[in-house]
Amino acid sequence: MRIIFAGTPDFAVPSLRAAAQRHEVVAVYTQPDRPAGRGRGLTPSPVKLEAVARGIPVFQPQTLRSPEALATVRKLDADLMVVVAYGLILPKAVLAAPTHGCWNVHASLLPRWRGAAPIQRAIEAGDTETGVCLMQMEAGLDTGPVLLSQRIEIGEQETGGQLHDRLAALGAQVLSDGLGLLRAGIRPVAQPQPDDGVTYAHKLDKAQARLDWAQPAQELARRVRAFNPWPVAEAILAGERVRLHGAVALELAHQHPPGTLLAASKQGIDIACGEGALRVRVLQREGGKAITAADYLNARRDLPALR
């Protein structure tokens, strides 16, 4: 089959590899190169790097809404377009251009967590399971019928980064299964999404990563896990702003104001929350690298009462 692949971040790379394994990927669409790093030089997306390494033609339009962009898609004469975390809206004309339309690999069990950040929002909400859906795309935001799906459990201490990697691999497998069926002349049965159970995974930003100690410790611990490795939770601890890379909630009754340091040891730094306490295990000072609580205490000799 002739396939157009559209994707941008690391999450999409395993799916591109799966598509290219037994099919002809005639073109890759990805976001334009963006400034990144200390030098702010233009940096290609992970998907572009993979496509270039495979010798696949790369297209990086600012939009797919122009007549020129549509003409290019049609000229590729594709059987199918596969979209994985691309980042641009596909107009109806593009969705209809390939023979079999457009498939999307989405990192949630739809209709739960439609939108941009389903992995992080699932952890933040305390979901115990999630998965991947292969969806036939339509004009709405992640509203199309589901062709195939797989579910997995979310680990009790699993971070957003760890779950991201597992779902990226699972998404590639689900896509491979779907492409195998289509190649054999079997079109997966499209199951409409139910009207109930719809939630939206709004895009992450750094402002959401600022923790408020007045919130319950369980909620804060989930946010620390969800926002690792990006945007990384941050809070005021012992008078300075730090980033939190690892923490667990403690069911601890106390009468202390939120933000009070309750105890500190090699096991972690315990901070009073609106309910319970948060034990910070790995943190990062401004301008520094991530360190253990023990190393942080060694650097903060001004906290003798907590040792």
Curated annotation (Swiss-Prot):
**EC?**
2.1.2.9
Spell out the Pfam families in the cross-references.
Answer: Formyl_trans_C, Formyl_trans_N
Where is (6S)-5,6,7,8-tetrahydrofolate annotated to bind? Answer: S108, L109, L110, P111
- Can you provide one Gene Ontology molecular function annotated for this UniProt record? methionyl-tRNA formyltransferase activity
For this UniProt record, give its keywords in alphabetical order, as a comma-separated list. Answer: Protein biosynthesis, Transferase
Please name the InterPro entries in this protein's record. Answer: Fmt (IPR005794), Formyl_trans_C (IPR005793), Formyl_trans_C_sf (IPR037022), Formyl_transf_N (IPR002376), Formyl_transf_N_sf (IPR036477), Formyl_transferase-like_C_sf (IPR011034), GART_AS (IPR001555), Met-tRNA-FMT_C (IPR044135)
Gene Ontology CC: one annotated term: cytosol
Q: Answer whether the UniProt record assigns the keyword Protein biosynthesis to this protein.
A: yes
What does the record give as the reaction this protein catalyses? L-methionyl-tRNA(fMet) + (6R)-10-formyltetrahydrofolate = N-formyl-L-methionyl-tRNA(fMet) + (6S)-5,6,7,8-tetrahydrofolate + H(+)
Q: What does this protein do?
A: Attaches a formyl group to the free amino group of methionyl-tRNA(fMet). The formyl group appears to play a dual role in the initiator identity of N-formylmethionyl-tRNA by promoting its recognition by IF2 and preventing the misappropriation of this tRNA by the elongation apparatus.
Membership in a protein family: Belongs to the Fmt family.
Name it.
Answer: Methionyl-tRNA formyltransferase
